[in-house]
Structures are given as C-alpha cells and as structure tokens.
Regions:
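Rossmann-fold NAD(P)-binding glycine/threonine-rich loop
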Residues: 104-124, 230-281
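Short beta-strand elements in bilobed, periplasmic/extracellular small-molecule ligand-binding domains
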Residues: 54-68, 182-185
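Short glycine-/small-residue-rich Rossmann-like dinucleotide-binding loops
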Residues: 96, 208-211, 230-231
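Positively charged, low-complexity intrinsically disordered leader regions
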Residues: 1-27
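Short, well-structured alpha-helical segments in soluble
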Residues: 74-86
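Anion-binding alpha/beta catalytic cores of soluble intermediary-metabolism enzymes, centered on
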Residues: 92-153, 171
C-alpha cells in the first residue's frame, strides 16, 4: 500500500526549505488566494489541508468564501483585481461553482502565470507540446506516485477512468509522453458496458470520477498499480472510487482513501506556487 502521507511529508519538508530560502533572498512571502463557493465536503477537506500546509511552509493564505448573492461579474472583477495585485502569486478556484457560472469564461479572466492549478487553457495547451509549466496538482501527484512504483513505463497499458481537465486529460498526455498505451474512459464507456473490460487489462489504473467503489476489486489485473483519486463520503466514512479491500488483494501497489493521493496533491499545489513565485521574482534559489 502506498503511504501518501509519508510521501507528502518528505516533499513538504523539501518545499519548506525552498520557501525559506526564497524569503531570505526576496524578503517577501509567497501569497495565494482561494475562491470557494457553497459547501462541499471534498472541497472543505482540501481547503483545510491547503491552509494547514500553507502555515507550515510560511505561505500567506487568503480564502474567499462566496455566497449565492455573488454574481459572475463580481467574481470577474475580483479576478481582475488579483491579476493586477503584485502581492498575489497564485490563484485557486475550488469547484463546484454556482450553476450560473461559466467556468471556462472565468478561467480566461485568470492570469495564466497565477494559475497554480494548471487549468488555464494556455497551461493545458502547453502539455500538448510537452512544455511543463503549471501542471494540475492532482495529475502531478499521480505521476509522483507512479514514478516511485514504475521502473519502465514503455508499452504499459494505462487505463484512466475520468476525463476531467484536472486529472484525466492532463494525466493522459503526461503518460503518453512516457510511451505507454493510454485508454481514457468516460461515461460513454459505462453506457456501452465496457468499463470492466478495460480495467481488467490495465497494468496501471487511475480512477478519478467521484463515484463510491465504482471499480470492483475483482476487475483488477493481478499485479496492477492502482491509483484511486476519488474521495466520497458514504455515511460517516470516506471511501474512494475503487473497492479497496478486494482490490488490494490483487494489486502490486494501491493508494488508500483517504491518505493516498490527497496529501500529495496539496503539496504539488504548493510546488506550483513556488514555481510561480520564482518566475515572478526571476530567481533560481
């Protein structure tokens, strides 16, 4: 089993040293702004993790909790203010947003240099040309996990369930660059009842859909690497998208939920903030 907390602690310690060196060099702390709409259990967990890690790293963390009265024009104006605010190094927009908001339109108003989630069209487009600028923290976390498990990617059958711009799409491009054969599954795969078929042949399986135990343990190929990105609240329990107890009997490596991908994702977000801060101050410290 992969201990995400342990990996995250090691990475965070290294980041703390880098942020400290930058503070000594520049005399200012990195600062990030986070927008959150409505109450969402997964978002709340992530926000608490961000805030805690920011405190540990010496990063200034500003949270904007938006209510239903906050309209799109108001949020766009806030984005404009932050884009021109030289004190802000990174911006995060937590999803889900209000139904009335056009998320893509909102993204286009964000300064790509301050997009530390790697979701601005420019940053996503850079992945196609293998220019790794700001990468989705979740996709980066998955790659960090896989790099610790995989000796040779070439020719591996990779199956990714979920084609979001946060996980599935960027991860597919990153893994294709490793010369793997990537299958990207989505709701259409389930509609034609072919999900199990694809899962059964996966050497590497990544699941990120937000559906409790969607993937059954008995589907897992013997010796496969399983990365479960999902986080779902079922009663008083937090579970992933994979039927963990059965899957771990077949997988060579598997991430638990919680304490798997999540802690590393938060560190990767801060790594993107560090890179944005370095770029703004034109330093290699």
């Amino acid at each position: 089993m992969i201990d995400g907390k342990k990996i995250a602690l090691v990475l965070a310690e290294s980041l703390k040293k880098e942020f400290s060196l930058l503070y000594d060099s520049c005399g200012v702390k990195a600062k990030m702004a986070v927008f959150c709409f409505n109450d969402d259990s997964a978002s709340d967990i992530y926000i608490k993790a961000q805030s805690k890690l920011a405190g540990y790293l010496g990063v200034e963390y500003q949270l904007f909790k938006l209510n239903q009265e906050f309209d799109l024009s108001g949020l766009k104006q806030k984005f404009s203010d932050l884009n021109s605010d030289s004190d802000i190094d990174g911006v995060v927009v937590m999803q889900p947003l209000a139904d009335s908001f056009d998320f893509r339109s909102l993204l286009l108003d964000m300064d790509p240099a301050k997009d530390i989630e790697g979701i601005h069209p420019i940053n996503l487009g850079n992945l196609i040309s293998s220019e790794l600028t700001s990468i989705s923290p979740t996709a980066a976390a998955v790659m960090n996990i896989l790099n610790s498990c995989v000796d040779d990617y070439v020719g591996s059958e990779v199956v990714i369930i979920g084609h979001s711009h946060i996980v599935g799409k960027p991860l597919a491009m990153l893994l294709a660059d490793k010369l793997t054969t990537v299958t990207l599954c989505n709701i259409g795969t389930s509609k034609v009842n072919r999900l199990e078929e694809h899962v059964r042949r996966a050497d590497i399986l990544v699941v990120a859909v937000g559906k409790p135990e969607l993937v059954k343990g008995e589907w897992i190929k013997e010796g496969a690497i399983v990365v479960d990105v999902g986080i779902n609240k079922v009663g008083s329990n937090i579970v992933g998208d994979v039927e963990f107890e059965e899957a771990k009997k077949r997988a060579s490596y598997i991430t638990p939920v919680p304490a798997g991908v999540g802690p590393i994702t938060t560190v990767m977000l801060m790594k993107n903030l560090l890179l944005a801060f370095k770029k703004k101050h034109n330093t290699r410290v």
